Amino acid sequence: MHIKRTLLAIACATLTLAASAQDFNKHFEDRTLRLDYNFSGTNRTQQISLDELSQSPGWYGRRHNLDSLLIRGNGQLEVKLPDSGKTIYRYSFSTLFQEWQSSEEATKVQKSFENVFLMPFPKQPVDVTITLSDTHNHVSASLTHRVDPKDILIRQIGTTGQTPWKYVHQGGDSKEVIDVAILAEGYTEKDMDTFWEDCKMAKESFLNHEPFKSLQDKFNFIAVFSPSKESGISIPHKNLWVNTVMGSNYDTFYSERYLTTLKLKRVHDLLSGIPYEHIIILANTENYGGGGIYNSYMMSSAHNVKTRPVIVHEFGHSFGGLGDEYFYDDQYETMYPADTEPWEPNLTTLVDFDSKWKDMLPTNAKKSKIAKTIKGIDITEPDGKDLYTKVGVYEGGGYQSKGVYRPVQECRMKINEAPVFCPVCDRAIRRIVKYYTE
């Protein structure tokens, strides 16, 4: 009896995989279509412009769940068949442009930001729609355009002149696992031995940390040896400017520790023809800092005493779509409006708590002290015990001390000292991995 059940389970799994492959092969080729856009505007306006289309050999993104989304993000890409209107591919993301819109600078000037998205190369003409949403999850900008795979102006890239690369960790075939590229920023040709050691450090930071440790056969980590003309990273508040391959700098949006690059086209140029789906950028500096943007990239200093936890934290943003759980009393006051449920799986405003970690709350017998009750939901009183594992509803998160709630007292998404992701973040990452690979 057990043998029959096992054989039936194997048969069902095989049929599911075959159906996924069939669906992919029906609509797409084993190539990548790269779409370059410019997002521009002010704090109140948004405009989307198509810049360029290009194609490269191989598709290294997901081949499962092509027409569904696990996380909403602040923006979405949707691909439809023109005749039937059938959705054949969806992708969600966040952008630095939308984050910039909440800054004081955005009230004074209009700016433009590069954005690059990848999708499998279609076998027939498709309609591609890019949609941006505001903090209330209302559509704030949208652009739909036709892509004809026979268009002679779709530039061919990635066939020659690839940036040198090699695997740091290979969990499996690129068609079955998640490819993560690790790029060098601020490393000269002479620094590449150091970069290789830094890549191994980054890989170990992930694979020694749950849930990545248990899921290491689901990931490939690839070192990409992208040389800069000068060593180091630009730090504007110290009047230090360095000629680096991706032009990154600290002081993003005038925040000293916020390390990013705005040159996304350059980032993807360096990766042309290389297996990649997610991007890590290691910065050759001891200066503390980093940044992570959901389904865009994450960046971290490589030589700071806190580099290891920062790398894991920022990957939580860029890969897992996790929100920051720390908070202030006077910043980002409108980042998470009280009438809108955040899309990040580890934050809630209680508008739709059922969709978050309500099912993970302890039974009545094991509940902690209740601070207050809002919308029928008990808000947990912090007690300093079981800091990283006791799931509750703790007020303070998403940069706001009031009105936004987090799952535990301390988590990797709140402080560097936390040794683990909390149970809610752990589950969210595992779900993402399953979404990409099954």
Language-model segments: what does each one mean?
Residues 194, 291-314:
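Short pre-active-site segment immediately N-terminal to the catalytic Zn-binding motif
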Residues 315-331:
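Catalytic Zn2+-binding segment of zinc metalloproteases
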